[in-house]
Amino acid sequence: MTDIKIDQTLDTLGLRCPEPVMLTRKTIRNMAEGEVLLIVADDPATTRDIPSFCEFMDHQLLNSETENTPYRYWVKKGL
């Protein structure tokens, strides 16, 4: 685990592509710049999709744990 301060948590366990990224986008849209979203997922596609989403949308992927499920991603909202 990490010491990153989490502002919101999004549980996408049991959901499959494209739902985890769609819910991430919807959730982060309502957050303030600089806030951190913890995404919990078990869809293997998120190991590719969440980092790509962050890069495309100018959010910062602070950390990820993808060795075992559930996967965890800490995303800091950009502009």
Swiss-Prot record:
Q: Listed GO molecular functions?
A: sulfur carrier activity
Where is it localised?
Cytoplasm
| Listed InterPro entries | Sulphur_carrier_TusA, TusA-like, TusA-like_sf
Q: Pfam families attached here?
A: TusA
Q: Does the keyword Cytoplasm apply?
A: yes
Q: Alphabetically, which GO biological process terms does the record hold?
A: tRNA wobble position uridine thiolation
Q: Which UniProt keywords apply?
A: Cytoplasm
Q: Which positions are catalytic residues?
A: 17
UniProt main location, coarse: cytoplasm
Quote a single Gene Ontology cellular component term. Answer: cytoplasm
Which CDD domains does the record match to this protein?
SirA
Q: Which HAMAP family match?
A: Thiourid_synth_A
What does this protein do, in the record's words?
Answer: Sulfur carrier protein which probably makes part of a sulfur-relay system.
In which family does this protein belong, per the annotation?
Belongs to the sulfur carrier protein TusA family.
Against PANTHER family, the record matches this protein to: SULFUR CARRIER PROTEIN TUSA (PTHR33279:SF2), SULFUR CARRIER PROTEIN YEDF-RELATED (PTHR33279)
Question: What is the protein name stated in its UniProt record?
Answer: Sulfur carrier protein TusA
Q: Which organism is it from?
A: Actinobacillus pleuropneumoniae serotype 7 (strain AP76)
Species lineage: Bacteria, Pseudomonadati, Pseudomonadota, Gammaproteobacteria, Pasteurellales
